[in-house]
Amino acid sequence: MSDEYDAELDELLRRKALEQQRKALEEQQRKAELEAKKDAILRVILTPEARQRLANVKLVKPELAEAIENQLIALAQSGRIQAPITDEELKEILAQLTNQTRKDYKITIRERGWK
């Protein structure tokens, strides 16, 4: 009787593992399709130099690059920007965004009077 339960438990665990693998594979495929669509749109709205610059930004600050990609795609789809965006225009966009998100830190050192 214990062997039956063990076999049944093993079967349930195997099915659950297969289901999780299937879901992970589907999620990976969905992300790859989305990335391919984004890439295709960015090829249309960015010059090769601008795409290279964005790829360099993505290496250093992936979150910033992702935000810029999403904004550019949204602006292009709504017709608010003229394609293709040059490297110089992308530099201006990057400068504006980094100025908005930049945090300035101030360090103050006070003497404690230890002598």
Swiss-Prot record:
Pfam families per UniProt: dsDNA_bind
Keywords: DNA-binding
InterPro entries membership: DNA_bind_arc, PDCD5-like, PDCD5-like_sf
One GO molecular-function entry: DNA binding
An annotated GO cellular component: cytosol
Family under the similarity heading: Belongs to the PDCD5 family.
PANTHER family: PROGRAMMED CELL DEATH PROTEIN 5 (PTHR10840:SF0)
Protein name: DNA-binding protein STK_13740
Organism phylogeny: Archaea, Thermoproteota, Thermoprotei, Sulfolobales, Sulfolobaceae
